[in-house]
Structure formats: C-alpha cells, structure tokens
Amino acid sequence: MPTLDAPEERLRKFKYRGKDASARRQQRIAVSLELRKAKKDEQALKRRNITDVSLDPSDQQTKGVSLTLQEIISGVNASDPELCFQATQAARKMLSREKNPPLKLIVDAGLIPRLVELLKSSLHPRLQFEAAWALTNIASGASELTRAVVVGGAIQPLVELLSSPHMTVCEQAVWALGNIAGDGPEFRDNVIASDAIPHLLTLVSSSIPVPFLRNIAWTLSNLCRNKNPYPSDHAVKQMLPALFYLLGHPDREVLSDTCWALSYLTDGCDARIGQVVDTGVLPRLVELMSSSELNILTPSLRTVGNIVTGTDHQTQLALDAGILGVLPQLLTHPRPSIQKEAAWALSNVAAGPRQHIQRLIACGALPPLVAVLKNGEFKVQKEAVWTVANFTTGGSVEQLIQLVQAGVLEPLINLLTIPDNKMVIIILDVLFFILQAAEKISQKENMCLLIEGLGGLDRIEALQLHENHQVALTALNIIERHFSEEEETVTAFRARDQDHKFLKDLTNTYHCCTTPKPGPRP
C-alpha cells in the first residue's frame, strides 16, 4: 500500500491557489484512477446470439432431427452441402442454448478450422450464416475460446463477409467481430489491422434496419474500447465521423453504445479528448445528459466527465456547451451512481482556473453540492469533498467566502468522524485553506468562531489524538496555526465583535442553509 505524503508535502501540493490548474487537475485525475477502476462498466463486452428453440424457423425444417456430437463433427466436415448445412446448424443450435452451451466441447472437437472454411462458401449463404453464428457464440465465451477463433483464422473471412450481399450474413459477421474485438486490445487491434473499420463504415446509413445498426454501433464501441494500448490514432479518426452520425440517431440502444464508444475514446490523454471534442459532439452529449434513459445518461455523463479532465480549453468548450446547466440537477438524481458521476465531473471543473470556478458558482451548483455533502451516500460525499477541495485550492478569497456562505462548513465538519483517513485529511486541508482565506481579509477570528460554533474545534482537537499519524499532524497544524490564542482572548473577542457584520452574515447564512444535523451514519 502506498504511503501518504508528509504533511508539508501534501500541503504544498494543495497550495496551487489557481496558478497551475492543469497540474491540479492532473493530480485529481491520478487520484480518480481508483474511482475509475472501481466503477462497474454497464456495457457488455461480449454478446451471445441466443435463440428460443421453439421460435426458430429452422426447426420446422429439421423437426425431429437431433444429431449427436459425433454426427455433427462428421456432417460439418462432409462434402455434401446440405448435410454440411444441417450439421453446422445443429452445432449452432447447441451453441445458442440459453443455459450451459457446450462452447468448449465444440472447440475441443476441432470444428473451428472447418467453420472458418465454411465462411468462404459464397455459393451457400445459409451455410455462411450458420458458420458465422456458431463462431459468434464461441467468441462470446472466455478469452481462451475467443483466442481459438482468432488462431483459427476467422477474422479476415469475417471482415470479407461485411461486403456480403446477404444482410443476415453481413450482420452476423459484424456481431462476431464485435465479440472478438471486445475480448481485449490484442484482438481489437487484430480486427482493426484486417481493415474492418472501412467495411463497417460503409454499412452505416439511414436505410439500414435498426437491429443491424445496433450491432454496428456496439461493434464500433468495442473497437474504441480498452487501453494499454489505446486504439491507434488512425483507427479513431476513421470511426469518429460515424460515431458523430450515430449520436444523432433516435434509437436508444444505438445512442447508448455510441456514447460508450465516446467515453472510451475520451478516457485518456488530452490529445484523445481533443480528437473527440473537435468533431462537435459536445452540444449533443449535453442534450443526452438530460435523458430519462439510464443507459444513455450514464455514458453521456461519463464522456463529459472525461472531457473536463482535459485541458482548460477543452473544459471551456464543455462549459460553453452548457454542462453546468445539467450537472447541478444530476446531483439530485435518484440514483447515487449518477450523483457520483456528476460530482466527479464538477470536481474537475473546480480544478480549473478561477473563471471556471466562478461559472460553477453562477450556475447554482453550490446548494446541491452542499446537500449531497450532508445527506448523500458516502461514495457521493467523497466526490463532493473532492469538488470542495479543488474549489478551495484554486478559488479566490471571495470565491471561498461564497463557498462558506453556501453552508459547506457544517457537513465538512460532520464528515471529520468518518473512518476514511484520506478524506479526513482532505477535509482538514480544506478547513486550513478557508482559514487562510479568512486571514487574508482579517476575518480569521470570525471564521474560527464559526467553525467552533459548528463543533469543528472539538473535532479537530480530538483528531490530534488520532491513531493515524498523518491525520493527527494535520489536525495539530490547524490548531497551532489558527486556534492557538488564549481562551481569554477568544472570549473577549466574542464579546467585543458579536455584532460584526462578517460573522453575522455567515451566521444568518447558516441559519438559512443548514438543517438539523443528521443522526450517526451507518
């Protein structure tokens, strides 16, 4: 487990004060890697073509015929096209069972080379279709099964079938290639190297049936998927115009997979983000962030969240496209997963220059942000804490005062009791910077009184005895730097300046913005 920085080093990292927003955002991206790895990807890597046997039209022709595995092996290798077709179809049906399909059994029987050969039977499109379907389902299995399909030489014949005049054959080839590409970057790049992308793009048109277009969008998303390495720049440039076109399609599954594709392409360096942003997709993505369909909202929000991890210019383009008109609303979404993504996106906006922070204030993001700090699920609260942390490290004194006036202190102080040492240290750093900002306008004592009145001083003092050395030192630093006056001095100050406008305004703000403290969190 990596060790935490020494207090001085950690504080130095937080002392950007708006001078290096790019470095601050990169620090946030590095920390968010843990969050990214923990996220469950809602999009399927592979899909098996399952058929309800009772609804399969081919059953009417083969009713009563049930071939054994040995008969299938013999038939698939037969020279008689009709016998070969029946055996290949029987193999496909076995592989299309909803439960426990014998994928490995078929592979171990050595049928893949013959199935690949049958893909080239241009005079028998029904046979091509059944062979492609069987290979699709084998490739939907574990990586070793997908590898068997690739090693068996299936990619190039499948790519050639993308030009088949028979739509069912062509669509099944698209599906098979999608499963192969979805296995990982190695096979994805094999598919790309076989010139699959230009063939796929010729299929994208307004006349294509929607179910077919769904398969194309999903396969393209798998060609955009995976890092280490990313897909090549050339491949990305080929796909982006088609993705831009698909982003305007009304079908929700097409939209979902297209948004996922864009989320994969933006989950990387600034140059990758720039390629996507330059296509002009941002206005449409912002529009889709208001979708009531979770399978569209999630990847569109993820994509925008990725974009604002980029350069200040890229973030500016996202702001100009209207993301701040949607993100505050998403903090109140009924799904915590959406709240978390929205807070993460806001944290990266807050990691930018002060003009970005000002736009965050102007859009009304602070009240819902404070609300999730108070009452959100812990995973959402953590992202909200990061937003506040980035805000305080880059914001001006005036902006920090607005943050305090929004009621941020009470929930932050309440979170000092959470069993997450990293978060506690970040919150302590936030309080440190707020006190520093107050000191710059000669209002530190008032801020100290406000923190004390909210129970903050007691909690910070208690943290000096925390078992975690970093937490204890950070708390001690705040006490020594900002709360070291004698009690008599503080008491005299309170009596003398009870009606001080600054303290009065903040106190009134807290009366208006805060609610009774919630009970202990589970």
From Swiss-Prot:
In this chain the ARM repeats are located at: 100-140, 143-182, 185-225, 228-267, 270-309, 312-351, 354-393, 397-436
Q: Which InterPro entries does the UniProt entry name for this protein?
A: ARM-like, ARM-type_fold, Arm_3, Armadillo, Importin-a_IBB, Importin-a_IBB_sf, Importin_alpha, PBS_lyase_HEAT
**What GO molecular function annotations does the UniProt record carry, in alphabetical order?**
nuclear import signal receptor activity; nuclear localization sequence binding
Q: Which superkingdom? A: Eukaryota
Q: Which residues cross the membrane?
A: none
Location (main, coarse) = nucleus
Gene Ontology cellular-component terms listed: cytoplasm; nucleus
What are the entry keywords?
Nucleus, Protein transport, Repeat, Transport
What does UniProt note about where in the body, tissue by tissue, this protein is expressed? Expressed almost exclusively in ovary, in germinal vesicle (GV)-stage oocytes, but not in granulosa, nor theca cells. Detected at very low levels in testis.
Keyword Ligase annotated: no
Using the record's annotation, list all stretches that form the IBB domain: 1-57
Compartment list = Nucleus
The biological process GO terms on file are: NLS-bearing protein import into nucleus
- One Pfam family cited in the UniProt record for this chain: IBB
Tell me the function of this protein. Answer: Functions in nuclear protein import.
Q: How does it assemble?
A: Binds to importin subunit beta-1/KPNB1 via the IBB domain; this complex dissociates in the presence of RAN-GTP. Shows a limited binding to the RB1 nuclear localization signal (NLS), but not to the SV40, nor NPM1 NLSs. Interacts with RSL1D1. Binds to the NPM2 nuclear localization signal.
Q: Per the similarity annotation, which family is this?
A: Belongs to the importin alpha family.
Q: What is this protein called?
A: Importin subunit alpha-8
